[in-house]
Amino acid sequence: ALSPLEADYPHTYLLDKEAHNGLLFYSRYPIREVQERYFCQDHVPSLTVDMDLDGREVRLYCIHPRPPRPRDDTQHLDDELMIVADELREQHRPAMVIGDFNEVGWSWMVKEFKQHAGLCDPKRGRGLYNSYGAQNPFLAWPLDHAFVTDDFRLLGIHRLRPCGSDHYPMLYRFQLTPA
């Protein structure tokens, strides 16, 4: 079903999992390295992708922690975000963190993560961009996020039409600013 993307996004990486958390990554830009990572739970994968954009190395974190269940502790999400934030503070290259955080952008943990990592929220001041709840738009929440270092300029954000998932597809367009 996704094979039409391969013409425009020839660089791909597939982490095929029997469980609910397989990951598929498509890119227009060459991929240098992909790390499959299990930050806090051995059955919940994330990807760290190093790519070349116009001769510059960019790091991309693709995260999707397991959704919380009633009476669940969210410590795994908190820990995963803070591990990524610590890494971002130590590295000095353009970076993005994208994914289904299973947390709204105004939650204490997401605010703490952005501040600790030194990331910008491109949605700030532009609207909620509810991404979860495609089956019932009246109960939608902004759970999918893209946070970036200040090396990127936002060109646009769009919530796309539902495509069969419980999440709306989100399209973020960024431009890497000159070094």
Which residue ranges define each predicted feature?
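Soluble catalytic domains of enzymes that build or remodel membrane lipids, polysaccharides, and related
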Residues: 1-179
